[in-house]
A protein has these predicted regions:
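Functional cores of ribonucleases/endoribonucleases
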Residues: 27-99
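N-terminal secretory signal peptides
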Residues: 1-44
Length: 99
């Protein structure tokens, strides 16, 4: 459950800080899938209705694809999320992003 583990924005990898800034400014995002609905099928994040969570790619240097790093944010309006979570292992674990 992502409720306990946190990570400060300043402690995210630089690519994560960049993605977080893009989320708050509403893009533009480099990947087509950025901003798509995240289903929370793993049920590691607090349970919410479908469409509440959206996922964004955190670039991984030298990865040939989108890599395993993501930021998932929840809320009514994508650029003013209620909460965002960072995963470095493709949704196996999450840490809540704090200021």
């Amino acid at each position: 459950d992502a409720g306990n583990a946190t990570v400060a924005v300043a402690d995210l990898p630089s690519q994560g800080q960049q993605t977080y800034r893009l989320i708050l400014q509403g893009g533009p995002f480099p990947h087509d899938k950025d901003g798509s609905v995240f289903g929370n099928r793993e049920r590691l994040l607090p349970r919410e209705r479908r469409g509440y969570y959206r996922e964004y790619t955190v670039e991984t240097p030298r990865a040939r694809d989108r890599g395993a790093r993501r930021i998932v944010c929840g809320g009514q309006r994508p650029s003013t999320p209620d909460a965002c979570y960072y995963t470095s292992d493709h949704y196996s674990s999450f840490r809540k992003i704090v200021q």
